[in-house]
């Protein structure tokens, strides 16, 4: 499989700050990667510092004064990355409640709704289907500080809201779950996409309750407890405004078929 992804971002900085971008794909061990990444501040090229986070996540950090910052990324991936490794520390970390996936608010509800499927592969289908039918995908309907409980009460949201609710419900029935930011060929509207990843029977499996794109062709960018760990841009100290952003993701040939009944791992 050959996949091509790209992102173009323009940010206005109105007070000096430190920026952290997470737009480069995670190190795809086992796949062939060709990529380019460039940043400018007021038209001048700047070399970022690359920090490596968990699960191959790459964060590019630099200081920026007032003016215009641009980020340009493009990558071609040939083949599939190796399955995500399983570490004991991850199985502990991704069971805990977090800022946007507050599993402790769902213990009783999730046990009643899904307890009979706990620790089974059927659970993944049941939770994903339940969230997908309970929520309406409405761009702009949620607030950036909304968590899973807010989303359930509102009954609507975008991809990160769907993923947070899936994650919270899974953690509430003792299944480790985490959020993954991905490039998603076929996604409409095209954007950075957020999905859930759950650990069952020795494997990390990807869930997308929005069903907006086939999971088989998704490309991992960053992985964490929730959106607090995976945002494509973090701003520290100053003030910024997102002016323009274009994301593209395509696969060579036809998009793969997908079914909520399938067990799929990112690769």
Where do the protein language model's features map onto the residues?
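Intrinsically disordered, low-complexity N-terminal segments that are enriched in acidic
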Residues: 1-80
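Secondary-structure boundary elements
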Residues: 13, 71, 81, 85, ...
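Generic structural "secondary-structure junction" signal
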Residues: 21, 64, 79, 116, ...
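Short, charged, solvent-exposed linker or helix-capping segments at domain edges/interfaces
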Residues: 21, 83-89, 208
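Residue-level signal for pocket-adjacent positions within structured domains
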Residues: 57, 90, 147, 202, ...
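Short, charged/polar, Gly/Pro-enriched secondary-structure boundary elements
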Residues: 80-81, 205
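Hydrophobic/aromatic-rich core segments of domains that either
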Residues: 129, 161-241
């Amino acid at each position: 499989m050959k996949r091509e992804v790209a992102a173009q971002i323009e940010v206005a900085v109105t007070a000096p700050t430190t920026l952290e971008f997470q737009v480069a794909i995670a190190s795809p061990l086992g796949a062939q990667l060709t990529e380019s990444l460039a940043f400018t501040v007021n038209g001048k090229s700047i070399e970022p510092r690359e920090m490596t986070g968990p699960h191959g996540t790459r964060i590019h950090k630099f200081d920026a004064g007032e003016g215009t910052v641009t980020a340009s990324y493009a990558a071609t991936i040939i083949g599939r990355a190796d399955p995500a490794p399983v570490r004991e520390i991850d199985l502990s970390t991704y069971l805990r409640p977090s800022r946007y996936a507050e599993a402790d608010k769902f213990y009783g509800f999730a046990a009643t709704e899904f307890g009979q499927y706990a620790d089974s592969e059927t659970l993944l289908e049941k939770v994903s289907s339940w969230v997908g039918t309970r929520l309406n995908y409405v761009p702009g309907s949620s607030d950036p500080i909304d968590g899973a409980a807010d989303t359930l009460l509102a009954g609507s949201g975008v991809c990160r809201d769907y993923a947070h609710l899936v994650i919270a419900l899974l953690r509430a029935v003792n299944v480790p779950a985490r959020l993954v930011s991905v490039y998603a060929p076929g996604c409409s509207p095209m954007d950075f996409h957020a999905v859930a990843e759950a650990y069952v029977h020795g494997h990390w499996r990807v869930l997308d309750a929005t069903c907006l794109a086939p999971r088989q062709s998704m490309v991992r960018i960053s992985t964490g407890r929730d959106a607090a760990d995976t945002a494509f841009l973090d701003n520290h100290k100053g003030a910024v405004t997102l002016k323009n952003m274009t994301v593209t993701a395509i696969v060579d040939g036809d998009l793969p078929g997908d079914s909520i009944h399938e067990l799929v791992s990112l690769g």
